[in-house]
């Protein structure tokens, strides 16, 4: 069951990423990632479904993943599955409560509750996913997955950080938007990779758990240690 959930999560995550990229490529002008789903945009419906699939995929990973045990205490305070489930819920809300045209920051005269809810959920979901990356990077069992998660976390933190600063200061906004898309892509590829890796691990554990016990072979009489008369009987 766990393996099936994780395989489904990988498929949904990859499909969601594909829909987000399809929306971006179909856009006729430069847009930030969240702007693809803004009310009135022709890409809104495709982007919304893409984000929904990502949210469902993340939730399935949280439900089907084997318990992860980060080595560092501050990373083990909250179970990774719980953090990932929270991120999934946040992305699900952000997919339904989209930002307004232009996706303005929810401050000053441009403030709207819609933008505040969308921005808050998107930031919370992304931050939660980044935290899970660090938790998996400090896991004690899956070393290959830990290295993959560490590299993903560093890449997302650096790229998203630079893109976010450019967005806040309204400087090089086009570059900032591209960096935001790249960071989003890396994060979603990590989610797909996490689901696929844990699915393979679940399948292997299932095979070991259902393995048939080895039947000991029956020992045969040793003629050399048998008395002469018994040995003669066997030889006839």
What is the meaning of each model-derived region?
Residues 1-8, 198-236:
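Actinobacteria-biased recognition of intrinsically disordered, low-complexity terminal regions
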Residues 1-32, 36, 40-201:
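Hydrophobic, aromatic-enriched alpha-helical segments typical of multi-pass transmembrane helices
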């Amino acid at each position: 069951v766990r393996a099936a959930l994780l395989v489904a999560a990988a498929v949904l995550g990859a499909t969601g990423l594909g829909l987000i990229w399809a929306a971006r490529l179909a856009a006729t002008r430069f847009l930030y990632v969240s702007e693809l789903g803004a009310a009135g945009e022709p890409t809104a419906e495709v982007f919304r479904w893409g984000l929904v699939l990502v949210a469902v995929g993340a939730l399935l990973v949280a439900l089907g993943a084997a318990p992860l045990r980060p080595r560092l205490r501050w990373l083990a305070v909250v179970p990774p599955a719980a953090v990932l489930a929270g991120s999934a819920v946040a992305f699900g809300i952000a997919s339904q409560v989209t930002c307004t045209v232009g996706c303005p920051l929810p401050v000053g005269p441009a403030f709207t509750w819609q933008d505040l809810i969308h921005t808050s959920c998107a930031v919370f979901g992304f931050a939660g996913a980044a935290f899970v990356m660090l938790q998996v990077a400090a896991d004690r069992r899956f070393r290959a997955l830990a290295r993959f998660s560490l590299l993903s976390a560093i890449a997302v933190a650096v790229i998203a950080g630079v893109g976010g600063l450019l967005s806040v200061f309204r400087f090089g906004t086009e570059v900032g938007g591209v960096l935001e898309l790249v960071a989003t892509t890396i994060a979603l590829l990590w989610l797909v990779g996490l689901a696929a890796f844990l699915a393979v691990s679940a399948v292997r554990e299932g095979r070991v758990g259902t393995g048939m016990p080895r039947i000991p072979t029956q020992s045969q009489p040793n003629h050399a240690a048998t008395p002469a008369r018994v040995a003669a009987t066997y030889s006839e």
